[in-house]
């Protein structure tokens, strides 16, 4: 999910017209039709899309249900995904009490003053009336579990970490800047992301993960989970619209054989090293995505990144679509019991030993708001 996922602006014109036969073999691994401003338009666009699969992410508390409705209207094409995006987790309370804290109690604890943690942030008083009522994390996890159990093929997404996001000011505060200075603490983000990953592991569902300006934190989170014998290697994680450096991508691939990478031109394509990054990914771990909510633009966006991959990897269109088609099919499969990651092809039988986690370069990504 990105600042432009609702914008129909394309990053560059296509080099050739989109081929419907190729699109039919591709999956948009990450998009946001549940955020389309026109629900009926989203239904129509999803039905007319030439893509083989549309992986529809949930992001906020409100659009989990919309994702279900989209799937109900187009079960052959929509793959529903349920989860809470880091932009929307500030309403979740980590309290172990069965009683939901008051709005003031919850947000005062979540957004303390930078100079005195016993006091709330000075910005909170103005914003507090506009913030959503608190919800226990345990209650949301119950909803997440119910949605996944009701949809046996559903994935977990979109979840993750975002160190760029600031809580937006509401329209009622017209004289204020677009964003406040309030940022959901990283510790809170990690707790919520990890809790959702635990649900994914327990129910054996794959994960779509958002990481903005948090490469080291993402690596550490995944490494900690990988070190526990709880079935993490059975499921796959897709690092969507990956914007890290080629060096970071190589490190993640060595450490996490169950990691895939999906790319969009609207986000990943901003990097001057985009083609170098595409070449740094193992050919069997590449996926494509649009990261768009304007569903009428999904085909064009996926086609655009498809062309970029062909160019960067010097693949023919047929070779590229064959690889992406196989990769998507492999992504959806579970690994055998007792494995620590993806099964290797005949050319990849040599086991990779995961190195000790090293510091990695910070990813330069724009503020999503």
How should these model regions be labeled?
Residues 84, 88-130, 163-182, 302-309:
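Active-site gating loops and adjacent loop-to-helix segments of metal-dependent hydrolytic enzymes
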Residues 127-143:
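Glycine-rich anion/phosphate-binding loops
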Residues 1-82, 88-93, 97, 142-145, ...:
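An N-terminally biased module of ancient metal coordination in phosphate/nucleic-acid-related enzymes
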Residues 77-83, 236, 259-265, 340-341:
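Short hydrophobic/aromatic-enriched beta-strand-loop microsegments
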Residues 284-299:
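Short acidic/histidine-rich active-site segments
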Residues 245-255, 270-280:
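Short loop-to-alpha-helix "cap/lid" segments that border enzyme active sites
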Residues 256-271, 292:
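His/Asp/Glu-enriched short active-site or ligand-binding loop at hydrolase and phosphoryl-transfer sites
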Residues 1-12, 303-369:
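Mid-to-C-terminal alpha-helical segments outside catalytic/metal-binding sites
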